[in-house]
A protein has these predicted regions:
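Carbohydrate-binding surface patches
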Residues: 454, 460-463, 468, 504-546, ...
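Alpha-helix-loop-beta-strand connector modules within alpha/beta enzyme cores
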Residues: 232-239, 336-357
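Glycan-recognition surfaces
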Residues: 261-294, 298, 344-476
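Carbohydrate-recognition beta-sandwich/jelly-roll modules
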Residues: 1-207
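C-terminal beta-strand-rich structural cap/linker in extracellular carbohydrate-active enzymes
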Residues: 565-604, 647-661
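Solvent-exposed beta-strand/loop surfaces of large extracellular or lumenal domains
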Residues: 108-118, 549-568, 635-660
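Conserved, mostly hydrophobic/aromatic
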Residues: 131-132, 177, 199, 209, ...
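Aromatic-lined carbohydrate-binding/catalytic grooves of carbohydrate-active enzymes
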Residues: 172-305, 312-334
């Protein structure tokens, strides 16, 4: 690391650790802490000497906005500068360097990679803390290694040390039903009744039903519109009566065309000239409430408490990025940066709603929500198509590339969309005029084939966060509804990428399963994606450290027994399809063992309650929120050294016995 520490030292940084891990910040004169401030610049010559020539190096860039796509790129004429926030990984021939911010709550910042070299900047908007002689930048780190996944794990542990603890020791593993992804803003009270009736009749095990944008009169006027004449308290009561937690969508910092903004113009976020700033959603501009103004903060608290008193305990909070997006903004409290304004606003929400409520922050700043959010969105809104530009492909990439943040919150990959539906929403429905709905005609459509739908559902499992569905349940095809068996209940373990830099979207993912049944050993689920347009089989690029049985739970077939160093080839996978394989460590003694079920992607991790084994039988008990048939498999040793697979079909809430004679 000496070449890097020497280069950083020449840039005037100050080290907290200067060994195999470089931790540092920079002391900046307060007169200079305005706008974009360079923290360091390491020239292309030094980077090349350290093993990272500008053009050949692959660069993984994390991204600030949920709608951006984290991923791996190289410099080109189209992308002469690659930017990342909060972290960037340089990769060249199994040689990796991670550079990232450790602190993420005081000011914005980003990293740049260009033919000139590696650069990091702090973004002080507005000018920082007038009256002080100097300020310190957020701490940063440089880590070096050969495995980018391990570097991100090391980085995550360091980020924990420099940021607030999560709001709770155990995040809620909710399964959420949401209305936006079919109805948009047009859902009515009667349609809610229809959804709840189907959830009850079909025993769909949802923890939360969330009412999305479209219930309110306007942004800032948080009272029900004409589609909800019985009121939102009654809607919450209906959801509770159906056995679920009431959830609701709000955007507390955006201001629509409402009287209170004219009555209290001082509550609006403005620039240095006093002009009220706006954030556009599509073509629609919205003014922004400034939570650093005490009166505005008190008003925000008042409507939050009113919604809480209606009975809502799950809050999807949207468009919070409006507080830090415009570098020209000057908060009422002129001693804070825009990122501190953002965190002040989110803190206001957390303190007002309390720990009883689950906060799902959508469209904010991931780092600055650490210690405040229960859930954050991992990517853009989902649609029921596969297209790379705006479909399932990119949503999976956004989700898995942000999985390292799972130590700080539960990820929300947005709703899984499984339906087959060629008809869009009718333009005659009541589209509330203050809400921008992109491509409303296609919002309710779904064109994923069976393989694509299964892969899109698999994204929820890979995320390891909450599971969310966005369907009109009265019309959902039964065979597509069964896909929910694979992800409900959530297992809560995010997947790790195996082939990080080998493909734009990695093909292989490992999920460590700690089974519900205490007598079963842990195992790994290896998920494989074929994002190509041709059917193909793939060679597993990872390694196994002990003999394992590789089992295909969906097909109830044994792929083989593999030792360290053996080549493991997947089954042929359809275009845009996936395979979920179970890697089971072989017992040291040759005796029968439980292999898998075909119910859930964990292959027995969440639904197997008990297992006991004798020389000739495997007995167990299943317990699931679903009432359905399940295939159960066990492995029995044969005298010739091979293994026999015995299967049985049983109910998902019953005992099972597997016998081999």
């Amino acid at each position: 690391m000496k070449i890097w520490s020497d280069a950083l030292n020449a840039c005037g940084v100050e080290f907290s650790a200067n060994t195999e891990v470089l931790i540092f910040d920079k002391k900046i004169a307060s007169s200079d802490a305005a706008g974009v401030v360079e923290l360091f610049f390491i020239s292309r010559e030094i980077c090349s000497a350290a093993g990272f020539p500008a053009v050949e190096t692959q660069v993984h860039c994390q991204k600030r906005q949920k709608g951006e796509i984290p991923g791996t790129e190289k410099l080109s004429s189209e992308t002469p500068v690659l930017t990342a926030d909060p972290a960037m990984v340089l990769y060249n021939q199994d040689h990796c360097l991670l550079c990232g911010f450790l602190e993420m709550t005081r000011h914005l910042g980003h990293l740049e990679w260009s033919e000139g070299g590696l650069r990091a900047v702090a973004e002080y908007h507005p000018a920082y803390r007038p009256g002080t002689d100097f300020v310190r930048s957020q701490k940063m780190v440089l880590l070096q290694g050969s495995d980018p996944v391990q570097l991100f794990e090391q980085y995550t542990e360091l980020v924990k040390q420099y940021n607030p603890a999560p709001p709770r020791s155990q995040f809620p593993r909710y399964t959420v039903g949401a209305n936006w992804h079919y109805y948009g803003p047009t859902m009515t009270e009667n349609e809610l009744d229809e959804e709840l009736a189907v959830i009850k009749a079909k025993n769909i095990p949802l923890d939360v039903y969330q009412l999305d944008d479209g219930w309110e009169r306007d942004y800032g006027d948080w009272h029900p519109n004409d589609k909800w004449n019985s009121g939102m308290a009654q809607a919450a009561d209906k959801i509770k009566a159906a056995g679920m937690i009431p959830g609701i969508w709000i955007t507390p910092f955006l201001c629509g065309n409402i009287k209170i903004a004219e009555q209290h113009p001082q509550w609006l976020l403005r620039n240095a000239s006093g002009e009220a700033l706006t954030m556009k959603i599509g073509p629609l501009p919205f003014r922004i409430f400034d939570p650093s103004h005490p009166e505005c903060a008190a008003w925000i608290k008042s409507f939050l408490k009113e919604i809480y008193n209606w009975g809502y305990r799950y809050f999807k909070i949207d468009f919070t990025r409006c507080l830090f997006l415009n570098p020209a903004a000057v908060p009422f409290d002129k001693s804070i940066t825009l990122l501190e304004l953002y965190r002040q606003g989110i803190t206001l929400l957390r303190e007002t709603l309390g720990d009883e409520c689950c906060l799902n922050l959508c469209g904010g700043h991931e780092g600055a929500t650490i210690g405040l959010a229960d859930v954050t969105r991992t990517g853009s809104d989902t649609y029921g198509n596969w297209a790379k530009s705006n479909g399932a492909w990119t949503r999976i990439q956004q989700c898995v590339m942000r999985s390292w943040m799972s130590s700080f919150r539960m990820g929300d990959p947005d709703a899984s969309i499984m339906r087959l539906n060629s008809e869009g929403l009718s333009p005659d429905r009541d589209f509330t005029p203050h809400i921008y709905v992109p491509s409303y005609s296609s919002l309710s459509q779904g064109s994923l084939n069976d393989d694509e739908a299964a892969t899109f559902i698999l994204n929820q499992f890979l995320c390891g966060g909450i599971s969310e569905i966005g369907e009109r349940l009265p019309d959902l095809q039964p065979e597509r509804l069964k896909l929910l068996h694979k992800i409900i209940p959530p297992c809560g373990t995010p997947a790790k990428m195996v082939d990080f830099f080998q493909h734009p979207l990695p093909r292989f993912y490992r999920t460590r399963i700690v089974p519900r049944c205490s007598t079963l050993p842990e195992w790994e689920i290896v998920s494989v994606l074929n994002i190509g347009d041709e059917a193909a089989a793939f060679v597993y690029p990872g390694t196994v450290n002990e003999p394992v049985m590789v089992f295909h739970p969906e097909k109830m077939t044994l792929l083989g027994i593999f030792n360290p160093g053996d080549k493991i080839t997947t089954p042929v996978i359809a275009p845009h399809g996936s395979a979920v394989l179970k890697f089971i460590p072989l017992p040291r003694e040759r005796k029968p063992f439980f292999a898998a079920t075909d119910l859930h992607y964990s292959a027995g991790g969440v639904e197997v309650e008990t297992v006991s084994v004798t020389e000739s039988t495997i007995n167990g008990k299943l317990s699931s929120p679903w009432d359905t048939d399940v295939k159960v498999a066990g492995a029995f040793p044969r005298p010739d050294g091979s293994w026999a697979i015995v299967t049985a079909t049983v109910n998902s809430n019953s005992e099972f016995t597997l016998t081999y004679a």
